[in-house]
């Protein structure tokens, strides 16, 4: 039995190699992808692992400050992730499982935080609820200190709630009403139906949302820097070690430690979803079926929750706009355009952000569809490795990627430090997994027989890809491009080590202005940046 299996495997491998040899363009494409991954993923990540010495590891592990910072990072990430997922699920459930009014309004407002850097949430909360906040000090005359774990928790919850909502809502939408209606016909009602059917089928969405929010909160740099106060986390501490203490080995050590919890979350999520099946094989859905909806009381409570959350988001967006157009928000509300003039004088950072984001979106979209075509439609040795390397950056914090780029390309033939190229490279690595998975999802919806017919008519893989696959993936390509552009415009942690005086970005400039006290100009650039996102 084992000999037969080995023979089949040998035959399969031999057949795959013969196909590659018959199609030189396909073979060259696969080798080129592995070469790109070796140079721009494996080499930089190996480089950052080799920088710290044994003494650096011991210095970090045995230091009381490190233990405190590591604990702070895990704790703040867990509570922010938990509340963001709860908020995201309740919001998504209200949108998809109730007949409440204002759904369209809620959907639009929930996406607004994604159109600005996450640091904007922290800035807005300082302006509204800080020591001299508009609500706490100006209106209520209260002395409130938001700096610390509480303020960081609130800021990260609001900043990353949209990620949880989008992910969970997509899964809830895809759940066929057949099973819920069948359970209802068998006597399941209310909480029991929700717990045993709906919640279980939504588990993939919850797991994916947990992964996205946990990684983003672990790697969050702007909010801990502005709102954290003396509550230090690994992302900000690594930055401080590199730029403040000039201790590059310790910065690399802390960045590697930041990867550990994100990789654990990544692999646990994948293992859990692969171990359990959530597929519902029901054939074609019966026409006319209406989804089971929540009762009047639950609908009312969910509507109130969605409205309060949307009002909080609108307050954040509103204070950004008002601050940019008023002389001194909280003291002098005279209309002014002075800060926009200052923003225009610094318009080069907006242009840099736009150019880098456009290039990143184009690279990740094209490379993502090419990778998806190879891993989904072609059989070749190393296909699983290619898929793993394409998805690896999604589990890595932005500060780790940025520092790895600096260490790898600081000298030698591929020296890129201080250039636009290294910024685009770092952002492209960060966004590649999203473009890749979007293309994979699109390809899986296309019948493979269409490409087989093209091959039977004499077309090679490149011609089939160009004339058959690409035209049918227009929607996936456009979604991938827009998402990569928006996320790149707002990225912070990935590029914090990559920018230079010659090539600065708007997101970095906003945080720098806020740290220096030039909040109005920073708000103005947030406003201008959002204009690009909303185009």
Predicted regions mapped to residue ranges:
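The alpha-helix within a helix-turn-helix
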Residues: 183-184, 454
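Membrane-water interface segments at the C-terminal ends of transmembrane alpha-helices
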Residues: 21-55, 64-173, 199-222, 253-270, ...
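Glycine-rich helix-loop "coupling/hinge" segments at transmembrane-helix boundaries
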Residues: 221-245, 332-333, 492-519
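Peri-membrane helix termini and adjoining interfacial loops of integral membrane proteins
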Residues: 7-10, 48-59, 128-140, 227-235, ...
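Short, Lys/Arg-rich, polar N-terminal cytosolic tail immediately upstream
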Residues: 1-22
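A short amphipathic helical element positioned immediately N-terminal to and/or at the very start
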Residues: 14-20, 55-62, 335-344
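Alpha-helical transmembrane segments of integral membrane proteins
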Residues: 267-304
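Helix-loop-helix hairpin linking two adjacent transmembrane segments in secondary transporters
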Residues: 236-261
């Amino acid at each position: 039995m084992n000999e037969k299996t080995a023979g089949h495997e040998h035959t399969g491998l031999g057949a795959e190699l013969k196909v590659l040899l018959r199609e030189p363009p396909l073979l060259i494409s696969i080798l080129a992808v592995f070469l790109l991954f070796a140079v721009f993923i494996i080499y930089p990540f190996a480089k950052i692992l080799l920088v710290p010495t044994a003494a650096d590891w011991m210095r970090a592990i045995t230091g009381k400050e490190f233990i405190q910072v590591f604990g702070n990072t895990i704790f703040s990430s867990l509570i922010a992730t938990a509340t963001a997922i709860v908020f995201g699920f309740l919001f998504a459930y209200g949108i998809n499982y109730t007949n409440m009014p204002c759904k369209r309004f809620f959907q639009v407002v929930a996406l607004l935080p994604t159109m600005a850097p996450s640091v904007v949430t922290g800035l807005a909360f300082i302006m509204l609820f800080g020591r001299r906040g508009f609500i706490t000090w100006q209106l209520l005359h209260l002395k409130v200190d938001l700096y610390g774990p509480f303020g960081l928790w609130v800021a990260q919850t609001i900043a990353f709630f949209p990620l949880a909502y989008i992910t969970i809502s997509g899964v809830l939408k895809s759940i066929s009403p057949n099973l819920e209606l069948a359970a209802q016909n068998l006597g399941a009602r209310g909480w029991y139906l929700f717990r045993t059917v709906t919640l279980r089928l939504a588990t993939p969405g919850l797991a994916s949302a947990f992964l996205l929010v946990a990684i983003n909160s672990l790697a969050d740099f702007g909010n801990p820097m502005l709102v954290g106060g003396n509550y230090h986390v690994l992302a900000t501490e690594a930055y401080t070690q590199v730029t403040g203490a000039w201790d590059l080995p310790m910065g690399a050590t802390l960045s590697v430690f930041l990867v550990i919890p994100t990789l654990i979350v990544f692999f646990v999520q994948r293992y859990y979803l692969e171990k359990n099946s959530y597929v519902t094989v029901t054939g074609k859905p019966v026409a006319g079926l209406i989804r089971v909806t929540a009762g009047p009381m639950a609908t009312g409570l969910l509507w109130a929750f969605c409205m309060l959350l949307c009002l909080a988001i609108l307050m954040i967006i509103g204070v950004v706009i008002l601050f940019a157009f008023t002389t001194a928000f909280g003291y002098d509300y005279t209309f002014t355009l002075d800060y926009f003039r200052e923003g225009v004088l610094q318009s080069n950072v907006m242009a840099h952000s736009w150019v880098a984001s456009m290039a990143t979106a184009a690279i990740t979209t094209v490379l993502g569809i090419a990778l998806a075509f190879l891993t989904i439609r072609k059989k070749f040795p190393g296909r699983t490795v290619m898929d793993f390397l394409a998805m690896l950056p999604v589990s890595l914090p932005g500060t780790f990627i940025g520092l790895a780029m600096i260490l790898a390309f600081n000298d030698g033939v591929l020296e890129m430090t201080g250039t636009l190229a290294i910024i685009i490279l770092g952002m492209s690595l960060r966004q590649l997994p999203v473009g890749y998975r979007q293309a994979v999802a699109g390809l899986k919806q296309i019948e493979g027989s269409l490409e087989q017919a093209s091959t039977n008519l004499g077309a090679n893989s490149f011609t089939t890809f160009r004339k058959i696959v690409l035209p049918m993936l227009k929607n996936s390509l456009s979604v991938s491009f827009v998402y990569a552009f928006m996320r790149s415009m707002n990225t912070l942690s990935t590029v914090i080590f990559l920018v230079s005086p010659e090539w600065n970005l708007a997101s970095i400039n906003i945080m720098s202005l806020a740290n220096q006290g030039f909040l109005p100009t920073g708000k103005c650039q947030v406003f201008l940046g959002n204009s690009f996102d909303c185009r």
